[in-house]
């Protein structure tokens, strides 16, 4: 009997314990007002410590005990708190929540919520470029250069340097496909339009280092662009003194498309330079992006681009004054029968296929092709004199003495044809708190290159250089090379999020491997980053990233200049060239706070990059000339600071400050700074509006950057170097908005179909500062050399009109 009593009591105890331990789950999605998922939203059951956080898809799960009147609190930086009360909770349930921005809209000005950044990848709002005063014609890169760690010393170019790296060390993706630049570009005047069309852009992400393994083999940075998939009809058209653009987006059931056209002519801007010339630059491109979704599980995309850049230049004369106030030097040139005609044409196409195998697994296939035909033709003949004086450069005037008189001629017939094709596969799988990503790609490259260029100078009738026994050209360069090669690459990575008593951790680790058939080199690149949001202060985010980043050579790096028996410089290809390597160490964090009821964020990052197997290079304007051999090592270290927030209520602005030191040792003997190491860089992006009348907007972009090291042409750093003066520039734009539905003129006739009309005026280089980008070198009969500065653009007024519909 006692045995039965004990058994019954044990069963009753177990049943009671099971009932007491019963739990229920609340799951759901948290989205913003636009329907986009919100990551890192904190969900807490009121008056308890029980909580959870949303993942990158905005999904959350929270476990609790059954009860009546359960209250959930949803909080996220930049959004109003939301509270949801469940009157009776006795079973699992789904609860979706929408959160609203904390900022108040002021007319058409609205503050973007400050998102948490647990990796080194930073999000950029693409719509900020719309009213940004930009001499390059409106590019995403013009906004990127205002970020900490990024610098640019040429307003005519969309190229940029990140933490002392080369322009070629930055990788750009559009919809997951790598895009390429022309290779022969030697000046900002020739460069034309950036590949990325801001009108078509939906989102922009940028990392200045320590990026994930899924991004390719570059040493400095990654710019990741995603184009729009419109849900309804939209479009805009703009025109200015620099050119114009237009785009149209639409959605037709299962098909959506966005197509854009751009035209740029910087003739008026180039007219502010020292050279009096007939400038005729014509840059055009058309891009289209189509999406087809036959089912909820299948998506197909096509991206196409055609770009044609033509640059025609007929110089007449040039007059440049330089030096100190007490000692002015004048350089005057006449150009008889000189001209330059360049043409760059690129074609790009990419097709992607995505298949959602399940709720947690997505697979993809992609194929792309890039074709570029580049042609550079010029014959520039000049008669010059270099003189000292304070009035003008006329040699017949008193007080003027000729320091050097002579003639020169520059000749080039350069052609390059490059073709790059690749096919690849990608995949992602979400398993519990892990997001596993993988991919593999094979890339075929075919490049043919023909170079024929030379330069001849004479002073007082003597050809230079003077050797005493022979007369030769000051420089010449010839090549006729072809290369066909194949690259293989693959990666796998895992993003793992977990919570402890200390806070939320985000760990991303992966490895990337590549092989290039041309130099028969394997490279392996492990990368890892860790983000942490502490429980004691969720306004604080800390992160650490490290990894080994290789940069496999492309065609430009392979060029090795040697001399033949006749003394001519000949370009050969170095198939023993190996990948450059950079080991990154980055530690940093963000702190978000409110000041005067406005949102602010302070970001700081310390970094150190150990560089070896470097291929040294020199820069002339934007043309990069590599040594063609792995003969250097070095380092880059610095501090990047960025202060972001509502400097003016209802607007986003920021100030970026970068301090750095970057050096290289060439052939174990020559120490020199890296070519793109300014030492310091201060950038400002500022937005404002007219007090009491918010339809008048002001956008300001300012840059103060240290000078870059310059070497004597064809000599390299072994012959010494000096730095250009600091780069200083402020561009200002003022715009007036006619808004649909609120302006009387917009309710009449044709205007009622428009959303907005913007009328604006830009003042480029408002302080009219003469910035030096490169130097023209004058050699006297005694082989003494003078460096004459090539100044960039002066002050220029630009008028703009933007129509949105």
Give the residues covered by each predicted segment:
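Short, acidic, small-residue-rich periplasmic hinge/interaction motif at the N-terminus
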Residues: 29-34, 41-46, 71, 75-80, ...
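Periplasmic N-terminal accessory/gating domains of Gram-negative outer-membrane beta-barrel systems
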Residues: 80, 93, 116-170, 176-211, ...
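Transmembrane beta-barrel wall of Gram-negative outer-membrane proteins
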Residues: 236, 240-263, 276-316, 340-369
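Face-selective signature of the C-terminal outer-membrane beta-barrel domain
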Residues: 293-308, 339-519, 603-606, 654
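Membrane-embedded beta-barrel scaffold of Gram-negative outer-membrane proteins
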Residues: 364-368, 576-630, 635, 759-762
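Gram-negative outer-membrane beta-barrel transporters
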Residues: 497-503, 607-610, 627-712, 802
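Surface-exposed extracellular loop regions of Gram-negative outer-membrane beta-barrel proteins
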Residues: 535-585, 606-626, 701-715, 770-774
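C-terminal beta-signal and adjacent terminal beta-strands/loops
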Residues: 653, 704-711, 736-805
């Amino acid at each position: 009997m006692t045995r039965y009593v004990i058994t019954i009591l044990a069963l009753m105890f177990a049943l009671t314990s099971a009932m007491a331990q019963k739990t229920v789950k609340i799951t759901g999605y948290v989205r913003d007002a636009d329907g986009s998922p919100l990551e890192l939203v904190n969900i807490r059951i009121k008056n308890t410590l029980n909580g959870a956080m949303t993942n990158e898809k905005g999904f959350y799960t929270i476990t609790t005990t059954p009860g009546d009147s359960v209250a959930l609190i949803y909080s996220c930086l930049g959004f109003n708190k939301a509270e949801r009360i469940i009157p009776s909770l006795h079973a699992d349930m789904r609860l979706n929540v929408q959160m609203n921005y904390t900022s108040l809209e002021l007319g058409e000005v609205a503050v973007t919520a400050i998102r948490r950044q647990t990796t080194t990848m930073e999000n950029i709002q693409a719509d900020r470029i719309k009213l940004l005063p930009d001499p390059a014609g409106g590019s995403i890169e013009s906004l990127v250069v205002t970020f900490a760690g990024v610098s640019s010393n040429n307003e005519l170019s969309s190229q940029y340097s990140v933490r002392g790296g080369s322009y070629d060390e930055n990788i750009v993706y559009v919809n997951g496909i790598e895009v390429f630049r022309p290779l022969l570009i030697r000046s900002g005047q020739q460069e034309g339009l950036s590949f990325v069309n801001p009108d078509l852009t939906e989102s922009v992400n940028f990392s200045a280092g320590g990026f994930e393994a899924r991004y390719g083999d570059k040493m400095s940075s990654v710019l990741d662009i995603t184009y729009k998939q419109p849900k309804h009809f939209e479009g805009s058209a703009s025109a200015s003194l620099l050119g114009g653009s237009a785009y149209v987006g639409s959605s037709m059931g299962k098909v959506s498309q966005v197509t854009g056209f751009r035209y740029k002519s910087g003739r008026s801007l180039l007219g502010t330079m020292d050279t009096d010339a007939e400038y005729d630059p014509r840059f055009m491109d058309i891009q289209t992006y189509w999406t087809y979704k036959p089912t909820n599980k299948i998506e197909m995309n096509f991206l196409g681009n055609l770009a044609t850049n033509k640059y025609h230049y007929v110089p007449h004369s040039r007059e440049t004054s330089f030096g100190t106030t007490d000692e002015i030097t004048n350089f005057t040139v006449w150009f008889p029968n000189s001209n330059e005609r360049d043409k760059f044409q690129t074609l790009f196409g990419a097709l992607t296929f995505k298949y959602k195998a399940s709720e947690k697994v997505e697979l993809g296939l992609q194929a792309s092709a890039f074709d570029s035909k580049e042609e550079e033709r010029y014959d520039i003949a000049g008669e010059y004199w270099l003189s000292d004086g304070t009035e003008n450069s006329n040699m017949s005037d008193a007080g003027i003495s000729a320091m050097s008189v002579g003639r020169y001629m520059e000749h080039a017939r350069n052609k390059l044809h490059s073709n790059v094709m690749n096919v690849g596969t990608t995949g992602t799988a979400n398993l519990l708190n892990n997001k596993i990503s993988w991919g593999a790609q094979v890339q075929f490259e075919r490049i043919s290159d023909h170079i024929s260029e030379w330069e001849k100078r004479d002073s007082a009738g003597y050809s230079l250089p003077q050797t005493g026994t022979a007369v030769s050209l000051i420089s010449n360069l010839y090549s006729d090379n072809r290369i066909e090669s194949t690259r293989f690459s693959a990666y796998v990575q895992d993003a793992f999020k977990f919570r402890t008593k200390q806070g939320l951790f985000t760990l991303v680790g992966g490895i990337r491997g590549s092989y290039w058939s041309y130099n028969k080199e394997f490279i392996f690149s492990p990368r890892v980053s860790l983000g942490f949001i502490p429980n004691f202060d969720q306004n604080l985010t800390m992160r650490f990233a490290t990894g080994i980043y290789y940069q496999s050579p492309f065609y430009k790096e392979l060029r090795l200049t040697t001399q033949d028996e006749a003394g001519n410089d000949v370009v050969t290809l170095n198939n023993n060239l190996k990948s450059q390597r950079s080991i990154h160490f980055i530690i940093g964090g963000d702190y978000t706070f409110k000041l005067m009821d406005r949102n602010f964020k302070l970001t700081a990052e310390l970094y150190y990059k150990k560089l070896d197997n470097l291929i040294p290079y020199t820069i002339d304007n934007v043309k990069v000339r590599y040594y063609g051999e792995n003969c250097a090592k070095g380092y880059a270290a610095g501090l990047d600071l960025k202060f972001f927030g509502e400097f003016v209520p209802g607007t986003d602005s920021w100030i970026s400050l970068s301090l750095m030191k970057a050096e290289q040792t060439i052939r174990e003997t020559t120490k020199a700074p890296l070519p793109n190491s300014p030492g310091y860089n201060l950038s400002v992006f500022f937005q404002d509006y007219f007090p009491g009348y918010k339809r008048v907007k002001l956008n300001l972009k300012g840059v103060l950057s240290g000078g870059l090291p310059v070497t004597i042409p064809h000599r390299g750093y072994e012959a010494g170097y000096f730095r250009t003066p600091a780069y200083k520039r402020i561009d200002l734009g003022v715009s007036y908005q006619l808004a649909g539905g609120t302006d009387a003129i917009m309710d009449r006739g044709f205007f009622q179909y428009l959303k907005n009309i913007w009328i604006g005026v830009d003042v480029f280089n408002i302080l009219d500062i003469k910035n030096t980008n490169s130097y023209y070198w004058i050699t006297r009969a005694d082989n003494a050399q003078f460096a004459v500065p090539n100044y960039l653009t002066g002050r220029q007024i630009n008028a703009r009109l933007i129509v949105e519909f």
